[in-house]
Every structure is written in C-alpha cells, then in structure tokens.
C-alpha cells in the first residue's frame, strides 16, 4: 500500500462527502437530481470544504446569496 492507494482513498472520501451534502441540498430544494448549483451550495455551506475548495469555480454553480 503506497501513496496511490492513500490518494485514491482520500479522493473517494472527498467525493462521497461532497455528493452526500449536494444530495441534501437537492432534497432541500425539492429536486430529485443533483445539479452543479447543489454542489456549489454544499461546498460553500461546509466550513472545511469551503476552506479547501473556496477558490474553485464550479461551472453553472451560480453565486451564493449573501444574506
């Protein structure tokens, strides 16, 4: 078990975490499909993900409401 295994595990965990949060955002918006907007909302809402991916542009993600 080397670096590629650990890298794959970290990428799989990060993907699963983002998809779980995006699924929650889709459900909150009464949608059955995850769209890029839901991914954008999920990343921005989680503090750790926002710190990691805050400067990443998600295509068709839109802007965050600043209320």
Swiss-Prot record:
Which residues does this entry mark as bearing N5-methylglutamine?
60
**Database matches in SMART domains:** H2A
Say where the protein is mainly found.
nucleus
Q: Which domain of life is it from?
A: Eukaryota
Q: Which SUPFAM superfamilies match?
A: Histone-fold (SSF47113)
Q: Where in the cell is it found?
A: Nucleus; Chromosome
Q: What is one Pfam family matched by this protein? A: Histone
Which UniProt key words apply to this protein?
Chromosome, DNA-binding, Methylation, Nucleosome core, Nucleus
Q: Name one GO molecular function term.
A: structural constituent of chromatin
* InterPro entries (UniProt xref): Histone-fold, Histone_H2A, Histone_H2A/H2B/H3, Histone_H2A_C
Identify the GO cellular component terms for this protein: nucleosome; nucleus
CDD domains in the record: HFD_H2A
**Sequence similarity:** Belongs to the histone H2A family.
Give the record's subunit note.
The nucleosome is a histone octamer containing two molecules each of H2A, H2B, H3 and H4 assembled in one H3-H4 heterotetramer and two H2A-H2B heterodimers. The octamer wraps approximately 147 bp of DNA.
This molecule's function is given as: Core component of nucleosome. Nucleosomes wrap and compact DNA into chromatin, limiting DNA accessibility to the cellular machineries which require DNA as a template. Histones thereby play a central role in transcription regulation, DNA repair, DNA replication and chromosomal stability. DNA accessibility is regulated via a complex set of post-translational modifications of histones, also called histone code, and nucleosome remodeling.
PANTHER family reported for this sequence: HISTONE H2A
User: What protein am I looking at?
Assistant: Histone H2A
Q: What organism is listed for this UniProt entry?
A: Olisthodiscus luteus
């Amino acid at each position: 078990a080397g670096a590629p295994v650990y890298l794959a595990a970290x990428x799989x965990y990060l993907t699963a975490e983002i998809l779980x949060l995006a699924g929650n955002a889709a459900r909150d918006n009464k949608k059955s499909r995850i769209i890029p907007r839901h991914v954008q909302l999920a990343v921005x809402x989680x503090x750790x993900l926002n710190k990691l991916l805050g400067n990443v542009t998600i295509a068709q993600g839109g802007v965050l409401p600043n209320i």
